[in-house]
Amino acid sequence: MAKSIGELLVREGLISEEQLEQAVAQFRRDGGRLVNAILSLGFITEEQLDQFLHFNLPVPLKIVDTGLSEVFLVDLLLKAAYLEAGTFTLQRMSQVLSLPFSVVEELIELVRTDHLAAIRTSSSYTSSTQVLELTQRGRERAEAAFKISLYVGAAPVPLDDYAFVLSRQSVRQIELDKEWIDSSLRHLVIGDKLLRQLGPAFASGRSIFLYGPPGTGKTSIAEGLGKGIPGEVFIPQAIEVSGQIIRFFDPAIHTPIEDKKNRGDASLDLRMNLTHDPRWKKCHRPVVMVGGELTLDMLELRYDYSSKFYEAPVHMKAGNGVFILDDFGRQRIEPRQLLNRWIIPLERGVDYPSLHTGMKFEIPFDQITVFSTNLNPLELVDEAFLRRIRHKIHVQYQTEAEFKEILRRVCHKQNVHYDSEVAEYLLSNYYLKQNRPLVGSHPRDLMEHIIDQAHFLQLPPTFTKEAIDSAVANYFVEL
């Protein structure tokens, strides 16, 4: 990972290959961060680095700035106006299409010139207050456009722009350290050895395989680290590929960051009121987790033959973030099928989605992919595939000290007094004597049994030997 940010600087022409090699040598010799080595050697200034790391997307002022054709945008505007019962305003169209007033004004001028719309009412000389209405010709063209695609919404961004931004805000340029991993996992009880493995794995920005028995916290670890990934990324609302539209932004996955200047109906009137191209939303890095419900078609572009546009696949929506495949091996598809789909993306860092026409296109495969499984990895995949997964980490059962600490935290969270003697009683009688492994999820589950019983008896829950005996009797299966 450390070198990847340097590679981006080389690609942008900010430093040379030779300078990168010198910086990497110093970084490996002295430690710290690669960017600090680049700065200390004087290859770039702090201002240049800051501009590089916190780039922005310029606001389009004219149709040509959008990267889309006039015909495409006019059809999109006509469809949006058609759904407004044929009457519309500049402000409303700017809001629906996520385009600045200046671009929509240019589009409206085109539709008026072609007699596709006419001014209905105007309270002043400003175009922003004019109410326009589609002409019969405009309605007919809108209906024809609907036959091509029912998509109405934010104007898409061109594929090339999406691919560039995806590479520019790569998850591999994030520099993570021990302080970050400690902070991200402070809510979990994890041994130092495991922490020392997890830190470099996530910091690499590469694929990770978490394996081990159930209940040991693999999913919680992946989620905690995923949600702790720092940084902001630009997410397109939609993408245009050869005239086809891919709906991309998903509110269930992408969490926008409040931006007062890019918010509200009136924010699109002037360039000075926009911080970036409104077709993009500034969001936290996405974290996507799928489990047994995953099927092979969920990893492909989904074309709706009735609406005639695409929905981006789930892993594509995780771009510049973290994709967690939980319970790997429990899916309805064979693990080998799933892994064959991802051999090239994991190995080469590119993916090749396919349109329903058969056309394929290339996009960067930029995400931290985490496989989590309770099964033996060697029974799921062959060694050749495991070699393509950079980090393989065995998450083992908890130690006695870790188990007790989890018990203490669970009691504290439920406002139940923790008794160390009761904890010793639980371990001695129900784990050590019975040679039962110390599973990290058991304290939470046992406490839930204790609380259920206390609620039934209309008593406050207590962490006592009697409560433990009752909870254990209902929790473990004895044959």
Model-predicted regions and their roles:
Residues 341, 381-396:
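A short helix-turn-beta junction within AAA+ P-loop NTPase domains corresponding to the substrate/partner-engaging
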Residues 102-174:
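Interdomain "pre-motor" coupling segment immediately N-terminal to P-loop NTPase/helicase cores
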Residues 186-371:
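Conserved ASCE/P-loop NTPase catalytic core
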Residues 390-403, 416:
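Conserved AAA+ ATPase "SRH/arginine-finger" region at the nucleotide-binding site
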Residues 84-96:
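Short acidic, hydrophobic short linear motifs in intrinsically disordered regions
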Residues 69, 166-195, 433-434:
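Dynamic helix-loop-helix/coil hinge segments at AAA+ ATPase domain boundaries and subdomain interfaces
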